UniProtKB/Swiss-Prot annotation:
Name of the molecule in the record: Energy-coupling factor transporter transmembrane protein EcfT
Family statement: Belongs to the energy-coupling factor EcfT family.
Record InterPro entries: ABC/ECF_trnsptr_transmembrane, EcfT
Function as written in the Swiss-Prot or TrEMBL entry: Transmembrane (T) component of an energy-coupling factor (ECF) ABC-transporter complex. Unlike classic ABC transporters this ECF transporter provides the energy necessary to transport a number of different substrates.
Protein species of origin: Leuconostoc gelidum subsp. gasicomitatum (strain DSM 15947 / CCUG 46042 / CECT 5767 / JCM 12535 / LMG 18811 / NBRC 113245 / TB1-10)
HAMAP family: EcfT (MF_01461)
Quaternary data: Forms a stable energy-coupling factor (ECF) transporter complex composed of 2 membrane-embedded substrate-binding proteins (S component), 2 ATP-binding proteins (A component) and 2 transmembrane proteins (T component). May be able to interact with more than 1 S component at a time.
GO cellular component, one term: plasma membrane
Membrane topology annotation: Multi-pass membrane protein
One Pfam family, short name: CbiQ
């Protein structure tokens, strides 16, 4: 459980760490949109190369990202199986009961798996190299024009920061509860997937109670510090774009142009 990396910030001084958080959010958003346009192995290879380069620039071991993918392995596997069994087409390779496994089904399964993994990796890069408070400030800055039409941008940014901070906290709490149960003879690593899932059920009530307690503690802490919404606040750190951000935007534009060149030339 403590392998989940989304929401965890790892301090560093890498090229990605030094980028303005707004730059990283824009790059992540544009990348996810571009991923939705990928339709052949060449475009997927190009988007994968971009993520690998980003991972390299974080100066963090790839094993850190790999460990972060392990907790969602079963979700990825379930999605792949759905694509294999429910994608029609020809030629038909073999049948599994009433289901037929086709070549288009295999290709769709591979593409969905790659898309899933790449989007998770890109999102992990954002949270791994950016503190939750910086992500909230970046979101508030990017969405600030919406204040004119009454959108509570500051409150949305605060909720995002709290949610990102609570993800690793809840995972750590889950790990503590699991360790306590293991010390009493409970096993979470034996049996099939269904048995393992049933073993998780007794953990939900103490986890839910712990989450509520943390939420109450946070609410009390905010209240005693005089927190109020819908007020104008100053910032301790003012966000400003630097030369390194211009380089990042240039790289992003180059990535998008090359992507659509590949897609157009290969009739993807």
């Amino acid at each position: 459980m403590n392998n989940i990396m989304i929401g965890r910030f790892v301090p560093g001084n890498s090229w990605i760490h030094r980028l303005d958080p707004r730059t990283k959010m824009i790059v992540t958003f544009v990348y996810i949109i571009v991923m939705l346009w990928a339709s052949n192995w060449q475009t997927y290879a190009w988007t994968a190369a971009f993520v690998v380069a980003m991972v390299k620039l974080t100066d963090q071991p790839f094993k850190l990202y790999w460990d972060g993918l392990k907790p969602i392995f079963w979700l990825i596997l379930f999605t792949v199986i759905l694509q294999l069994l429910f994608t029609p087409g020809t030629p038909i390779l073999f049948s599994v009961g009433p289901f037929q496994v086709t070549v288009p089904g295999i290709l769709n399964a591979i593409y969905v798996m790659v898309r899933f993994v790449l989007i998770i990796l890109m999102s992990t890069i954002l949270t791994l190299t950016t503190p939750p408070t910086s992500i909230a400030n970046a979101l508030e800055s990017l969405l600030s024009p919406l204040k004119k039409i009454g959108v509570p941008v500051a409150e949305l940014a605060l909720m995002l920061a709290i949610a990102l901070r609570f993800v690793p906290l809840l995972m750590d709490e889950m790990q503590k509860i699991m360790n306590a149960q293991k010390s009493r003879g409970m096993s979470f690593s034996t049996g099939g997937p269904i048995k393992r899932a049933k073993a998780i059920i007794p953990l939900l009530i103490p986890l839910f109670i712990g989450a509520l307690q943390r939420a109450l503690d946070l609410a009390n802490a905010m209240e005693v510090r005089g927190f109020k919404d819908a007020v104008q606040r100053t910032k301790y750190r003012i966000l400003s774009y630097q030369k390194i951000d211009k380089v990042a935007f240039a790289a992003l534009i180059g990535f998008v142009i090359i992507f659509f060149v590949i897609k157009t030339w290969l009739h993807g």
